[in-house]
Amino acid sequence: MTAQKLDGKATAAAIKSELAERVAALRDQGVVPGLGTVLVGEDPASHQYVAGKHRDCAQVGIESIRVDLPADVTEEELAQKIRGLNANPHCTGYIVQLPLPRHIDTNWALNLIDPNKDADGLTPASLGRLVLNEPAPLPCTPRGIVELLTRHGIELPGANVCVVGRGTTVGRPLGLLLTRRSENCTVTLCHTGTRNLAEHTRQADIIIGAAGSPGLINADMIREGAVLVDVGVSRTPEGKIQGDFTADVWEKAAWVSPNPGGVGPMTRAMLLSNVVDRAERLTADPS
């Protein structure tokens, strides 16, 4: 058996095509969605990610609002910029690009974001609403994973899912999404401290590798015909991206997401979706 590819690039392209039509319809009503980004410092990866997000905006017709700040920005200066986006009527939603410099408290900064404009779905308010099963912007990577699976015809209701990774951007919120009644999965949350990890992964229909531990899961640790989603991002000394699964899983699994080219494009597509979703809600109910 050679696994089929969970193609994030093609799926994200299809979603962006759908979003472009929705944005065009909004523009016909005089509504122009706007995505803002707050970028602090000169981290090359962060600059690359933000540039990609604004390219995506241009492709679907979303306006870009970019706020770039030096690495030594004070908390008060950052707070002023965030409050400015909260008040900006042209900004439908925005993100504060992480990581922030060490002198800036991340949770403090995220708490300043208007929860209704939280395009990443990662503010404490948004995550709290997710726990309570209340309407809120959904975290982009977990939402992208669910969308990637469903658009490839992977049956989620009743599936046993093993999520390996306990981070607040993927592992923890993904479990909340997958256990909603609309997905109805049974989720086991594991991590790098889990004893006998293979005992859990071998029982799973779907495994999400989100630990950021290269080669953590190999073919001996999965069942025949499993569905594997690789979210882990590590880099070799040569700078090559390496995921949480070893290459031999492709010969045993039914579906595997490539890394890169799997979840990454879906995350960016879901960021756009969160912005367009809010623009449509505002059009339906301006109050």
Swiss-Prot record:
Pfam families: THF_DHG_CYH, THF_DHG_CYH_C. NADP(+) binds at residues 165-167, 192, 233. Keywords: Amino-acid biosynthesis, Histidine biosynthesis, Hydrolase, Methionine biosynthesis, Multifunctional enzyme, NADP, One-carbon metabolism, Oxidoreductase, Purine biosynthesis. The keyword Oxidoreductase applies. InterPro entries: Aminoacid_DH-like_N_sf, NAD(P)-bd_dom_sf, THF_DH/CycHdrlase, THF_DH/CycHdrlase_cat_dom, THF_DH/CycHdrlase_NAD-bd_dom. GO terms for biological process: L-histidine biosynthetic process; methionine biosynthetic process; purine nucleotide biosynthetic process; tetrahydrofolate interconversion. One of its GO terms (cellular component) is cytosol. Belongs to the tetrahydrofolate dehydrogenase/cyclohydrolase family. This is Bifunctional protein FolD. It comes from Cutibacterium acnes (strain DSM 16379 / KPA171202) (Propionibacterium acnes).
